[in-house]
């Protein structure tokens, strides 16, 4: 069966369903790498993407964000000039009650009898204003980090915003953006 539309799974409207020891057939995570780039260097700025509201991000979207942002930064900045980290993990198990459709579906379908559903995927639950991903760069590469965040925002189910922090953790978004030429 194909992938369902993301709007079905993006709301946090059900209780958490994460206890894998009780879930038969729960799928494994597709995303396995959470830190990319130069992990040991110190950088001037931290650019983080925050959620504007609570949401669930499917593991397919997280993997697409990881590939897109990492490839963009490698191409424009170079592997040793950034550190990229995904800060959420897909714990939430998504379920689907498969409905039989078509001719003679009533013969073999269950309908709403025992409709709990079977595990079909994983998602990360994100709270409002929580950091989703972070890129550390120096001042000359800040423009590319903001471009990477813009590309990542397009793959999220709801809107998000980014913030720029200095080494001490102070929010310098307005100061930096006013001096930058985009």
Curated annotation (Swiss-Prot):
CDD domains in the cross-refs: Ribosomal_L16_L10e
Xref: Gene3D superfamilies: Ribosomal protein L10e/L16
Biological process annotations from GO: translation
Gene Ontology molecular-function annotations: structural constituent of ribosome
UniProt cross-references to Pfam families, sorted A to Z: Ribosomal_L16 (PF00252)
Disulfide bonds: none
Highest taxon, organism lineage: Archaea
HAMAP family: Ribosomal_uL16_arch
UniProt-listed NCBIfam families: PRK04199.1-2, PRK04199.1-4
PANTHER family registered for this protein in UniProt: 60S RIBOSOMAL PROTEIN L10
Similarity comment: Belongs to the universal ribosomal protein uL16 family.
Protein name: Large ribosomal subunit protein uL16
Organism, as annotated: Thermococcus kodakarensis (strain ATCC BAA-918 / JCM 12380 / KOD1)
């Amino acid at each position: 069966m194909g992938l369902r539309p993301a709007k079905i799974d993006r709301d946090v409207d059900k209780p958490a369903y994460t206890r894998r020891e009780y879930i038969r057939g729960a799928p494994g995570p597709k995303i396995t790498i959470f830190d990319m780039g130069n992990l040991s260097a110190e950088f001037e700025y931290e650019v983080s993407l925050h959620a504007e509201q609570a949401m669930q991000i499917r593991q397919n979207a997280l993997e697409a964000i990881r590939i897109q942002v990492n490839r963009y930064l490698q191409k424009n900045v170079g592997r040793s000039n950034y550190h990229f980290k995904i800060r959420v993990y897909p714990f939430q198990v998504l379920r689907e009650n498969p409905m039989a459709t078509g001719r003679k579906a009533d013969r073999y379908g269950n309908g709403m009898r025992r409709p709990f559903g079977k595990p079909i995927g994983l998602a990360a639950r994100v709270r409002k204003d929580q950091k989703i991903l972070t890129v550390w760069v120096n001042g000359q590469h800040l423009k590319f980090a903001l471009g990477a965040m813009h590309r990542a925002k397009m793959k999220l189910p709801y809107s998000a915003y980014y913030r720029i922090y200095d080494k001490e953790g102070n929010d310098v978004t307005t100061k930096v953006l006013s001096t930058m030429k985009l």
